[in-house]
């Protein structure tokens, strides 16, 4: 978003729009140092503040609704089996604090705001699977860390459809919804589903210590997790296409 700063008046860019979707944010599943943590913050808060300001400059009746991304990192991490809903408060780590600030920035917009706390997005061409699938095809795939950590995931089609539904029903979807599938899995469960879909073995784990050496503090994204369910999302009427990870992976790997 920084590349268009000064080249485009954002308020004029959104004038006449029914809704705005904000997905801006630097990747978290990489090595963090002090400078990159600043990038994680600025890439989210800077853009979101600009969008909220642009919306607020419009007359009230002309303001579009806002669908703004957040992440399940808002809740912190746990190894417990308790399922967390949208009602749970924020955790106490860096990502939780970042998500909390990110959401507050979005809610500065004086319009109907939907915050989507997104889990691990499964898609063939990128994201987590973009890094994991090639390893399985090379017969070298396996769980990262202990394998028992929770993975709250969502198929990309479901995430897109949730956001579209929020755009079409801004008053109904005002507030927070979890962008995760109804059936979270573990890292082992995810890798077993990948192995089944690719017809490859799930046998070569990546030790947690090695991942921490490689990613530093950023390793928390893949080594720790949280069991999150989309209670409010379903209460608002969304019906998931992919509720279980096996059907999602089969569609991604073997679908058209």
Where are these regions (language model features)?
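NAD(P)H-binding glycine-rich loop region in Rossmannoid oxidoreductase-like domains
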Residues: 1-50
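SDR active-site strand-loop-helix element
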Residues: 20-24, 66-72, 116-118
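Catalytic helix-loop patch of NAD(P)-dependent Rossmann-fold dehydrogenases
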Residues: 42, 78-115
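Conserved Rossmann-fold NAD(P)-dependent oxidoreductase catalytic core, especially the SDR/UDP-sugar
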Residues: 49-93
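NAD(P)-dependent short-chain dehydrogenase/reductase
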Residues: 93-96, 111-115, 119-151, 156, ...
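Glycine/proline-rich active-site loop of Rossmann-fold NAD(P)-dependent oxidoreductases
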Residues: 122-131, 165-177
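Mid/C-terminal beta-alpha module of Rossmann-like enzyme folds, strongest
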Residues: 162, 169-217, 250-256
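C-terminal amphipathic/interface module of NAD(P)-dependent oxidoreductases
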Residues: 220-256
């Amino acid at each position: 978003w920084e590349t268009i700063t000064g080249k485009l008046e954002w308020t004029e860019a959104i004038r006449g729009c029914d809704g705005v979707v904000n997905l801006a944010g630097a990747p978290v599943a990489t090595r963090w140092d002090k400078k990159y943590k600043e990038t994680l913050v600025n890439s989210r808060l800077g853009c979101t503040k600009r969008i909220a300001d642009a919306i607020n400059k419009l007359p009230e009746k002309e303001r579009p609704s806002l669908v703004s991304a957040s992440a399940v990192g808002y809740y912190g991490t746990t190894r417990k089996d308790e399922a967390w809903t949208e009602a749970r408060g924020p955790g106490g780590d860096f990502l939780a604090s970042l998500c909390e600030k990110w959401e507050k920035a979005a809610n500065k917009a004086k319009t109907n705001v939907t915050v989507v706390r997104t889990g691990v997005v499964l898609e063939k061409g990128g994201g987590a699977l973009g890094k994991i699938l090639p390893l399985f095809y090379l017969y070298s795939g396996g769980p990262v860390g202990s394998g028992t950590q929770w993975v709250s995931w969502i198929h990309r089609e479901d995430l897109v459809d949730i956001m579209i539904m929020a755009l079409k029903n801004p008053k109904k979807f005002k507030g927070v919804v979890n962008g995760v599938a109804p059936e979270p899995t573990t890292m082992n469960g995810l890798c077993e589903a990948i192995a089944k879909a690719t017809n490859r073995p799930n046998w070569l784990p990546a030790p947690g210590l090695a991942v921490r050496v490689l990613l530093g503090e950023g390793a928390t994204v893949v080594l720790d997790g949280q069991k999150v369910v989309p209670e409010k999302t379903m209460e608002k009427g969304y019906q998931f296409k992919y509720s279980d990870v096996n059907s999602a992976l089969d569609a991604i790997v073997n679908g058209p």
